[in-house]
Amino acid sequence: MSAPTKLILASASPRRVQLLQQAGLEPNRLVPAEIDETPLKAEHPRSLAKRLARSKAEKALERLRKDGEERDSFVLAADTVVAVGRRILPKTEIADEASNCLRLLSGRSHRVYTGICLFTPTGKLRHKLVETRVRFKRISREELEAYIASGEWRGKAGGYAIQGLAGSFVVKLVGSYTNVVGLPLHETVSLLAADGFKAYLNWPAGTQV
């Protein structure tokens, strides 16, 4: 199967777009999917990440069908969940939420799960769950206050962005770094490649970092 011409990302997340661009992939269209992200009763963080990724992909595909644009398109969605044990941390929107998350994460390990869901042009459903373990140092009161003042936590799962200032909190990371940012690149590119969409075909010659 030759590489399709369209890659649809079921997200408006700038960091997910940037990660795809890092791998040489430019989404042809962003179709953010508004869904209820509330965990079900006793839902495991793994299950939540998988369920939300699939819901986003299905919602985006439904919209594309209405627009008559689903043909020859890969529809990619992802959802990232941060958890301490089975306790799911919110995507923080207010400072108190972020402070509570960071106090909980301070000096201990947590897990970051990203569910990836991909609908192929032939209608196949592909999915993957990626897990990364992260350990934070003990965050001082002054550091916590400064981080909250930065506003970097807003809208972030677990109340932090590892690619930003919070990277200085990380003592140890086991697994995919890009998973913690919001889209595990190796697994995403592998899912696409399995159905003929090869990222390297878009790599420009003579690129310098």
Curated annotation (Swiss-Prot):
<comment type="similarity">
    <text>Belongs to the Maf family. YhdE subfamily.</text>
</comment>
<dbReference type="InterPro" id="IPR029001">
    <property type="entry name" value="ITPase-like_fam"/>
</dbReference>
<keyword id="KW-0963">Cytoplasm</keyword>
<dbReference type="Pfam" id="PF02545">
    <property type="entry name" value="Maf"/>
</dbReference>
<dbReference type="GO" id="GO:0036218">
    <property type="term" value="F:dTTP diphosphatase activity"/>
</dbReference>
<feature type="site" description="Important for substrate specificity">
    <location>
        <position position="163"/>
    </location>
</feature>
<dbReference type="GO" id="GO:0036221">
    <property type="term" value="F:UTP diphosphatase activity"/>
</dbReference>
<comment type="function">
    <text>Nucleoside triphosphate pyrophosphatase that hydrolyzes dTTP and UTP. May have a dual role in cell division arrest and in preventing the incorporation of modified nucleotides into cellular nucleic acids.</text>
</comment>
<dbReference type="InterPro" id="IPR003697">
    <property type="entry name" value="Maf-like"/>
</dbReference>
<protein>
    <recommendedName>
        <fullName>dTTP/UTP pyrophosphatase</fullName>
        <ecNumber>3.6.1.9</ecNumber>
    </recommendedName>
</protein>
<dbReference type="GO" id="GO:0009117">
    <property type="term" value="P:nucleotide metabolic process"/>
</dbReference>
<dbReference type="GO" id="GO:0005737">
    <property type="term" value="C:cytoplasm"/>
</dbReference>
<feature type="site" description="Important for substrate specificity">
    <location>
        <position position="80"/>
    </location>
</feature>
<keyword id="KW-0378">Hydrolase</keyword>
<feature type="site" description="Important for substrate specificity">
    <location>
        <position position="15"/>
    </location>
</feature>
<keyword id="KW-0546">Nucleotide metabolism</keyword>
<feature type="active site" description="Proton acceptor">
    <location>
        <position position="79"/>
    </location>
</feature>
